[in-house]
Structures are given as structure tokens and as C-alpha cells.
Curated annotation (Swiss-Prot):
A motif (Nuclear localization signal) lies at residues 756-773. Residues 710-719 have a biased composition (Basic and acidic residues). Signal peptide: none annotated. Keywords: Activator, Cytoplasm, Developmental protein, DNA-binding, Nucleus, Phosphoprotein, Transcription, Transcription regulation. Its main location: cytoplasm. Residues 720-734 have a biased composition (Polar residues). Embryonic developmental transcription factor. The lateral or ventral identity of a cell depends upon the concentration of this protein in its nucleus during the blastoderm stage. Acts as a morphogenetic transcription factor that specifically binds to the kappa-B-related consensus sequence 5'-GRGAAAANCC-3', located in the enhancer region of zygotic genes such as Zen, Twist, Snail and Decapentaplegic, promoting their expression. Part of a signaling pathway involving NF-kappa-B and Toll-related receptors, that functions in the apoptosis of unfit cells during cell competition. This is Embryonic polarity protein dorsal. It is found in: Cytoplasm; Nucleus. The keyword Repressor does not apply. In unchallenged larvae, expression of both isoforms is seen in fat body and gut (isoform A is more abundant). After immune challenge levels of both isoforms are enhanced. It comes from the Eukaryota. The modification Phosphoserine is found at residue 312.
Amino acid sequence: MFPNQNNGAAPGQGPAVDGQQSLNYNGLPAQQQQQLAQSTKNVRKKPYVKITEQPAGKALRFRYECEGRSAGSIPGVNSTPENKTYPTIEIVGYKGRAVVVVSCVTKDTPYRPHPHNLVGKEGCKKGVCTLEINSETMRAVFSNLGIQCVKKKDIEAALKAREEIRVDPFKTGFSHRFQPSSIDLNSVRLCFQVFMESEQKGRFTSPLPPVVSEPIFDKKAMSDLVICRLCSCSATVFGNTQIILLCEKVAKEDISVRFFEEKNGQSVWEAFGDFQHTDVHKQTAITFKTPRYHTLDITEPAKVFIQLRRPSDGVTSEALPFEYVPMDSGKHTFWNLHRHLKRKPDEDLFQQILRLDAKREVQPPTIEVIDLDTPKIDVQREIPSEMEFNHEESQQSEPALEQEQSVQQEQYTQEQSLQQEQYTQEQSLQQEQYLQQLEQQQSFQLEEPMQQDQELPAQQSFDQAIDHLPDHTSDHIPEDMEAADAHAEAEAHRLRSEQEKEIDTIIDEKVRELEQLDLGQQLEPRPLTANDKITEWMKSSEIEQQVHEPSPTAEADVLDSALEISKADKTLDELLETVAELDEIYTDFKVQRDTYKNTIQNELAGLQGRAPLQVEDSFDDAATYTSLQIAFKNPVLIPMDDIMPPTPPMSQCAPEDAHQHYDPVEVNSQARKPETPMRPVPPVPPAILTIQYPPEEDKLPPLPPKRIRKQDSNAENRSIEANTVQTKPSTGESPLNKRLPPAPKNPNFNTLPRQKKPGFFSKLFSRRKSKPDLAQGQENSSILDSKANSREPSIGHFNMQDPMRASLRSSKSAAPFISNPAPAKSSPVKAKKPGSKLTKPVGRSVSSVSGKRPAYLNADVVHIPLKGDSVNSLPQQQRTEGYSQSSTISVGAGLDRRTASALQLADIPISEGGMELVAIADRQSLHNLVSSIEGHFNVQLDPNLDLTEAEHFALYTSIPPLAAASEFDETSAYYAPVDAGEILTPDEVAKRLAAANGI
């Protein structure tokens, strides 16, 4: 490879080379010069590749293949919007057919194959571009050449594909594909390989040396570097300070943070921030640590610069100022204290402190006696001398201390003592002269009192208190000499005492002035003594040191005491404020407490004065679980305390909550509605097909739930309500009207919940028909009523005024009633409903209560349907008879002993008003009732005993035992809402049944 082949300056270098040869070989013979020129011409005749238009370095953005768009065309370096240019090459020294192969190589030497691909409209395949050069111009212009970048994970595959087509211009191999991090994906170079045609036409096997272009950078990564914001513009000289830098988009693999310092336009120090590629966030934020400054012992902040630098091309951003602060920055108090302690040996300070403490402990406290005749400066002069003496002793006892310091201190103390002695001597001389003048004036006044009296008004500066002396003396001159002498002596004595007082006041004023002057001199800055150093060190240890503040001296004890007094006063003030705050808090608390107590007392007083609510004390809200006793419409006043069980504890603890779950039953005798007067029963009309709809204003109360397990018994109660039996009275008296709620629309509707272990009431009320009965009932549906199939009596439509009184299976039945052809018989009959649809039997109901007919109505027969018996199982001639004529067991007029015992245990009356109480049930129900009685009363009855109807009646007339507190829950039917009605006792039930039957 020749120099002119690697760059585009070959033509321009020719003259320079010739000139250089002529200069170098001027002294050679002409023949040698001709030979050299001939060899140079031969070299020039060898063809080579020249790049006439370099590609633009930062004008193109590399596109990924997944972006699905054109990579764009690489413009030329001299391209403008008006005159666009493109990369161009030219073959020099050859004219003929030739082919050029263009591929991407790395930016740095050695030039290795780059994984990025070249794409274009023509000639581009497998990442390289192959074109035939124009043989006339020997120039090739690449006007449609783009760069398509690959991802890091695809580098190895791209280089492997390049290896398969054997495109390796500089024979460097493809081993770098296993080191993807060593490849700069943001910059490439274009490599041009030219192959000339050989002697065989169509075969280009003569290669020329390859040439490479200038680097081409990805415009996305090579954008302008800009620092937008720095979280801090200063750091300590130690470095390692974390800084967050915000910038424009940068490539995290090709960015660095540069710190540098310049002096006189030249860089004297340079360092780079420490960070990893993972510290670059979204290409717009860099978190790095500052480098260590080259000098640590700086006292002033050092001004440096910070900038972004791109290592690939060396481009830098605009430099911003940055400061390196001293290592004690932000710690002035600590470092100043440290330096102050290092000025003098620490042993000197500590020894001085210990010596003074020991001296204070040994010497007893002394009382200072102040002489008014002697100035206080003498006392103050003793303190430096004492300190000097102590210092000399310390120097003698500690020879290891520095002698220079002791000499300086001695000289200073001597000079101070001499100055103070001279000053005190001058002051004492002035005081003596002043006193002598005063004494002379006093003696002169005593010798010549009369002359003194005349001269006193002129001497007001000395004594203004005796200005009135001439007036007194002139007023008291006696006539005789003795009186004059006595008066003169008295006046002299008075004047002497006044003069002494004046002298004392003058001396005191002078002494104060001297003290103030001396104190002002002492407060002037001067070298520190041992005590000064101790005091300053103690204050600095408390972090109270201030720069250039004069240290307190031993003579300023008065100021220290005043400061202590002010601190004590301040502490006292703080304590007083605290006490005041506590007193205020206590007062507020007391007021609030009194207000709260008064409020409670007022409320209690208001409650006491308020009229009590009209609430019946006898009402027991826990008694609602006996809701089945409310069987009739009109209420009856009943003494609740005698019948109802006591209130459970939970109702007392949470009465409000109890009212949320059930409705109280109000029993008021005044609210009773007048009973409908009994009217005679009209004669039975012929059968008329009419549909009886039950009234909607009243509903039967639900049955009591079982107390064995907590469950929602509403479904069972609804099933029981829908399946009841009515008795047909034989008299014309009209009974009470009761109406059922509307039946469900679904004929197969069943509300019984599924229970794994059904209880007593579930077994008693939910017995179903057998399959043979259901099959037989479908055949005879046109003749028989659906209730006959289930053998279950019902009081779904009970109306004493209905001439065709009969039983329906449920309120769902809409078929007409068929009256019994034998009106003399008053027993309940099974009505026939031709054409009715057979309904699914529901739970058995034993809520029907009837009275046994008198003797003339076959009173010795108790009708108890046995298990398995039905109307279908009876002979055909008996189907039209009443229910009392079918499948009965004659018990007789009396009850057996076991039955009577069971009834007595259950507190059930056996007979009332010449009649016996009966009920209808099957054998399984009787067995369940016996088990219930045995469990409640703790007795053992005969398992084979069949209870009579009277025992079943006791199930609804007796009061259930007291409910446990655990049964008071929301799902229990004990608290189901019921309609207002009256609760009847067994006696009242018997009386009403007798009246209904005409007894």
C-alpha cells in the first residue's frame, strides 16, 4: 500500500515529492537522478483507488432492521441542500472494466469487518454492496447507500454471514465476533475493494489495495454533547462525591465525564469521573463520583471545569465551572480548634489546669478587705505577680517545658508589672498632693474662721455645703467672748465633719475613675497568659470560640460574675415560664374535667326530671321465639311475667342490637278489635265451582325453629305455612278468619334446606310421599285431591262462613271445593278436585288443632293415620267417605297410663269442658315427640308408645324452655318478624274449639 492510496491527496503530493527529490539529490550525478525519476514514474503508473468524495461523518442515523424503514442515503461531506453529493471513488492509472465491493469495517486499526450492513436499491446483498465501475469515467458514485445496524445479540450471526461470503478486506479474521463489547456500534468506516478484469473476460480477479473512508458516526449517538444540570457544583478534595448530571441523549458505551484545570490557557490537571455503563439512565442522566484532586492541603476553593467527552471522536461539551473545596470545608469549628490545640503543647495547658485546681483545693477561701484610702489598683497588681510566681514555679518543677515561652512570658509580665507600678506611683503621688492641699485648706479655715466665713462663698468648687455659713454666724454672734468661743468651736467641729465627708466622696470618685481606666487598658488586645489560654481552651471545647475575640483575664472576675448572675436569672425565668405553662395546662384540664362532670350531672338531672318512656316492663323481647303461639288475629291481654321465660343476658347487654333482629310484640288490651259476632251457618248450597283466594292482609306466624343447630329456618317455616289443615265446624258459628300468603308459582317449589343431620322438626314436617303413591295419584288426579295423596291435612283456607268448608293441599290450589254429602258429620273430609295437577308433597304440618266430637258424634274414635296408609290404600267404597271413616284406630274413651304420664310431664290438659283434645300425626311423628319429651324432661318412656293427639297439641300450647344465650343470632327464626295476634292458653283454645263445634 502506498501513501497516496490510503488518502485522497495523491495528485497534490506529486510536486512535493519531486521537489523533495531534487533537493535531496542535488549533489548526485544526473544519471542517477534520471534513474530515480524513471522509477517514480513506474510507481505512478500502477493503478490505485482514490476517494474523491468522503462520506459525511454525522449526517446519518443508523436504522435497525426491525424499524421497517429505509436506512437513508449516506450524503457526501460537501453535500448541501441545494447541491447534494454522495461518496465517490475513482480508479487512477487504469481504464477498463472493474468491480468495486463496499463493506463496513471498524473505526480503529486494524480494520476488522463490522457487523453493520450496507443496504440500497441496487447491488446490496448480504450486507455488502457490489457495483461495476463505469469504464469510461472510471468513477463510481454511491447515491443510494445506507447503513443498517444490528443488535448486540445479532453481532455474532452477522459476522458469521460475512465470513461465509469471504469479505475480509484486510485479512484480520473474524475472531472478534466472540467479543461484542470490543466493537463500537456507533461508528463505522466504508472499505472499497476494487477488482479489475483479468485476461479472461467476465472474471475480475486482479484486486487493488483496499481503501477506507473517514469514520461515519451514528447521528443518534453522535448528537451534540450538552450538560443540562448538575446536582452540585462543588466537592471535597478527597473526591468520591456522588454527582448526578443531566444531559442530552448520549451513548452509555461512548461517554465520559472530564475534570480539568487550566492555568494561562494550558491544562495543568485532568481526571475523569468514575461510573459504569449501568449508571447512565435513559441516555439522559449520569451518576458518577468525582475524582481526587491533585492537591489536598489547599486553604481556598480550587476552581476547575467539568465537561462531557466522547472517547470515540474526542468531541467535548461546553465546560462548566466546578470547585474543589478544602477538606475542612463545612467543619470550621472543629478544624480551627484542632489547629489551635496544635500550636502549643497540650501538656502545658493541662498542667496549668491541674495546678490551679490543686491550689484552689489547698488554699482556704479568703475575704477581701478593701481599704478606701488605698486604690484598688494595688490589689489588682498582685494578680499578675502571683501568676508570674506560679509560672516560675511551674518552670522550675517542669524543666521539660519550652524555655522560650517562659522567657517571653517573664519579660511580658515584668514589663506589665513595671508599667503598673509606675502608673500606681503616679496615681499615689497625685492623691497625696491632693490630700495635702485639702489639709492645708482645712487648717487655714480653722485658724481664721471669720476669714473663712468671708472666703467660703468664693470657694464653691471645694465645699458647696457651707455656703450658708456667713448668714448663720452673723445671726448668732454673742455679746460675750465665752459664748463666742463656744460657738466657734461648735462651728469648727461641724465644718471638720463636713470636710471629711467631702474628702471621702472625692476619693471614692477618683478611685472609680482609676478602676475604669485600668479596666479599659486591660481589655485591650495583648499576648495570652497561661490563664488566658486555659480559659480560651475551655470555651473552645464547648464550641463557643469566636475568631479575634479577646480572651477574658483574671482581672475580669466582676464581668464573669455578672454573666453568671444573668445566666442564673435567665434560668430562673425559664423555670418560672415552665411553671406558668404547667399551671395553665393544669387549669385547662381542671376546667375541662369540671365541665365534663357538670355536663354529666346536668344530663342525669335532665333524665331524672324527664317523664319516663311508656314501655311495658313486662314485655320480654326474648319471648319472640314462641311466635307460633300467636295464632289468631285479635290480641288478648296476657300476663307476660307469669308465662314468658326470663330475659336472657344478651338481651340485657345489647338491647339495641336485639331490636335490630326481631320485632317486639306489643300486647295491649285496648287495641283489641271487636270479634266478629257468630252467625248461623247457612244451608249448604249445591256445589258451585268457585275459587277461594286467601286474604292478603294477614299471614300465619312461622313455626319455631329447632334449637339443636343454628340455621336459617325461614325456608322450612314458609313450607309449613303453605301446608296447613282446617277443620270444618258443624255449627253455624263463624270462627276467626286467617289467611295465608300467596303460594309460589312453581308447583314443585320446595323451600326445605338440605341438612346432613335433620332435627326433630325437620323429620316431623318434611316427610315425603312414596313412589307408588305418586304413581297412583297421577291416575286418579281427576277424582282425588292432591292432598289426599300426601295424607297431610291443611288449614290453608279456613273460613267458618264457607258452606263448602274443606281442606286444600296448599294455597297454590285453585280448584273448586266439593262439600261432603253427609252434613251431619263434622269431621274433616278430603275434598276431591277433578282434573287437578298432582303437586309435590311438602313437609308435614301438625299445626292443626281440633276437638274430639261428643258422644253422639262417635267420640270414642281417635283418627290417627298410620305410616303407609293413604286414601289410595283404602277400599274403593271408602274413598267417598270422610277422612274420619278411613284407616283409624279405636283407642277408647280413656287414656293409658303412659300417655297420661307423658301429658302430665308436658303440662298438657287431657280434657277440658267435657271434651278430649286430639291431633293428627303419623307414627314416626309420635316417636319423635316421645324422644323430645324424654330429652327435655329427662325421663325414659316406652319406645313402642304411640302418643295421642293431646300430646301433639301440647307441642304448640306449651311454652318452650328458656333459650340459651348462644341462640340469639341473626339467622335464628326465634327472631323472625310475626304479625300481631293473640297468644292463647290451652283453656282458651279448648273453649274456642268447643264454640266452633257447637258444644
